[in-house]
Regions:
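Extracellular beta-strand-rich solenoid/capping regions of secreted or surface-exposed proteins
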Residues: 55-67, 76-120, 132-140, 166
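Acidic Gly/Asp/Thr-rich repetitive segments characteristic of extracellular carbohydrate-active
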Residues: 23-57
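Hydrophobic h-region of N-terminal signal peptides that target proteins for export
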Residues: 12-21
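Extracellular beta-strand/beta-solenoid scaffold signature
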Residues: 78-85, 106-115, 130-137, 157-168, ...
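Functionally critical loop-and-helix segments that line ligand-binding/catalytic clefts
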Residues: 250-256, 268-269, 274, 287-291, ...
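Extracellular beta-strand solenoid repeats
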Residues: 49, 61, 69, 77, ...
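Sec-dependent signal peptide recognition
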Residues: 3-13
């Protein structure tokens, strides 16, 4: 009996060796000529190798664990008929494809690659053009979207989709992607425990990054440039935004970063350069803003209502038209140990900290918020005079909003 059991264990152990995965080749001159046929012939853990060429196919469904691999970037043309690749199995890899002409719909979110209720997937090395949605993850988890190039041709918001979208998904890595000319570059909704790193999202119609109801996420080393409305972060908690660049997001409703109803977050080491508003903050609490650079923005920071217990420290505010804008006389936030290029105080004891507190909120910023047309008076002698009078005896701006320890030198 023991010998029989031993033989059975050995057979089970050796079974994967005898049942090795195979490769199904797809090309015009191959036995298998279409991608759908290749997937149908494949078994679990096989590789479907798509040779270089053009394949006019859409509604390609991957319903088993396999690798869909392109050789020399074969073109899959959906001919504007609908979605192109749909993954409904765990343990799927899609790699090395050039996908074009996703269909447009007002009732369905057609995507170049859609992953539905799947886990342990890898979507990488894709080039996507002429698309509605690019990569759409729906109720999926434990996957990676890596090194893809997504180039849309969006003109209007109503008939365009997002580059990478996550909906009710968890534990996803989005890394090293380039997204441009879509509606929102990266969009997350109900997506928790995700990591978004080293992506470039630029020249999109609306937001470079837009997420809501998504908690415990990390955003690191991304660049968001020249997007219609910048970046919007809403109704989320426990997020980390580290070492990102937000630049050249200009417009009357455009921000480097919009925070709305965000709690318990860390915003550290980011660059906000040449935006209409560097950070616009609404209803957001207990956030640490440290070691950020605010350079040549219209407003570096706009603090609107219901923002409490936030800490701004060791940031550089350099050459912004307005450093801080506040719409209330009450202040529960701390602005200490920052560098301000507009600070004109002195440091007699040479300890690197100014001996006179700095008031970052100017009366003129208050006036411009109420009456935008007054911006034409900027840098006039009259404005200098009223700013000075408000500095001496605050009436309209919070009298306790001070940097008590302004730094004399920029933080590296």
């Amino acid at each position: 009996m023991f010998q029989i059991r031993k033989i059975l264990y050995l057979a089970i152990f050796l079974l994967p060796i005898f049942l090795q995965a195979k490769t199904v080749e797809v090309c015009d001159s191959c036995e298998t000529k279409t991608i759908k046929e290749g997937i149908a012939r494949a078994t679990a853990s096989d590789t479907v190798l798509i040779k270089k060429g053009k394949y006019n196919e859409f509604d390609i469904v991957i319903d088993k664990p396999l690798t869909l691999l392109g050789e020399d970037y074969p073109v899959i043309d959906g001919e504007l008929k609908g979605g192109i690749i749909k993954v409904i199995s765990d343990n799927v890899t899609v790699d090395g494809l050039f996908i074009i002409n996703v269909g447009t719909s007002y009732t369905e979110d057609y995507a170049a690659v859609r992953v539905v209720k799947s886990k342990n997937f890898l979507i990488q090395n894709l080039v996507l053009e002429k698309l509605f949605f690019g990569i759409y993850l729906e109720k999926s988890r434990d996957g990676r979207v890596f090194h893809n190039k997504i180039i849309g041709d969006a003109v209007e918001e109503y008939n365009s989709g997002n580059g990478i979208q996550l909906w009710y998904s968890q534990n996803i890595d989005i890394e090293n992607n380039i997204i441009t000319h879509v509606r929102d570059g990266i969009y997350l909704e109900f997506a928790n425990d995700c990591r978004i790193k080293n992506n470039i999202s630029s020249d999109n119609l609306r937001y470079g990054l837009h997420f809501m109801f998504s908690n415990n996420d990390l955003y690191e080393n991304n660049t968001f440039e020249n997007n219609g409305a910048g970046v919007a972060v809403m109704f989320s908690k426990k997020i980390k935004m580290l070492n990102n660049t937000f630049k050249e997001n200009w417009g009357t409703a455009s921000y480097g970063l919009l925070l709305k109803e965000i709690n318990d977050a860390d915003i550290v080491g980011n660059i906000f350069k040449e935006n209409t508003i560097g950070i616009n903050i609404e209803g957001s609490n207990r956030i640490k803003y440290t070691k950020n650079n605010f350079i040549k923005n219209g407003w570096a920071i706009k603090v609107r209502g219901a923002c409490y217990a936030n800490i701004f420290s060791n940031n550089n505010f350099m050459y912004n038209s307005f450093d801080v804008s506040y719409n209330s006389k009450l202040n529960d936030n701390k602005f200490d140990q920052n560098y301000w290029s507009g600070y004109t105080g002195y440091d007699l004891d040479k300890n690197g900290v100014g001996d006179v507190p700095y008031r970052p909120v100017k009366l003129f910023s208050y006036i411009v918020n109420r009456t935008p047309e007054t911006i034409i008076l900027m840098r006039s002698l009259f404005i200098d005079m009223i700013d000075f009078s408000e500095k001496v005896s605050p009436v309209f701006t919070p009298d306790d909003l001070l940097d008590n320890f302004p730094l004399m030198k920029r933080q590296e």
